Amino acid sequence: TPEVLAALDAAGVHGTFFVVATGYNEKYLPLLTQAAAAGHQIALHSASHEYSDIYRSSAAYWKDIALLKQRIAPYVDAESIRYLRFPGGSTNTVSRRYGGKGLMPQLKTEVEQRGWQWVDWNVCAEDAVGGHPSADTIYRNVVRETGEQTHCVVLMHDSATTHTTAEALPDIIRWYADNGYTFLTCLLYTS
């Protein structure tokens, strides 16, 4: 995350960070304070990211979100966060395996009933699909997936196994800027 924050800062761009708070990355959670202070949006993703656990039922999903909020509360105002991204996206099919075909529609309704907003992506950097893609491959993936779209929500991952994402970020930002795009957090985009 320090490299991603540095790249965003150098470009004067703010992003939205959908947070995972599993055991392997809890040591990085203090960086959320820095990210929020720099003007980035902090949003919810998952405490465990274990599909078989979180998608067993609505109760299991919300238990995971409550645990996530508990884990990030020392670093940001977790209770004020109203944006989330479902693991696998809002149209994922893996949730059906564990919670049935009605689970995702139910969860989307429950998010909205809470006055929250769920966010999906329409451009994927494909930086977490395995094989450790190069920075150039990530860049090309983003450009290809953007195509003729005028409004893009780009999914990128920031983890120990996706370090080339941070390397690709300056070129991706430059490409979007050169092609007339503006950069907004999800909060500003939906406001």
Task: Describe the function of each predicted region.
Residues 23-24, 91, 161:
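Glycine-/small-residue-rich active-site loops that bind phosphorylated ligands and cofactors
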Residues 1-86:
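Active-site beta->alpha N-cap acidic-glycine motif
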Residues 189-190:
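Conserved small/polar residues in nucleotide/adenosyl-binding loops
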Residues 50-76, 92-151, 165-167:
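Alpha-helical scaffold elements lining the catalytic groove of polysaccharide deacetylases
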Residues 143-185:
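Catalytic grooves of carbohydrate-active enzymes
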Residues 83-85, 90, 155-156:
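Active-site groove signature of glycoside hydrolases
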Residues 5, 29-33, 105-109, 170-173:
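Short amphipathic alpha-helical segments and helix-helix/interface helices
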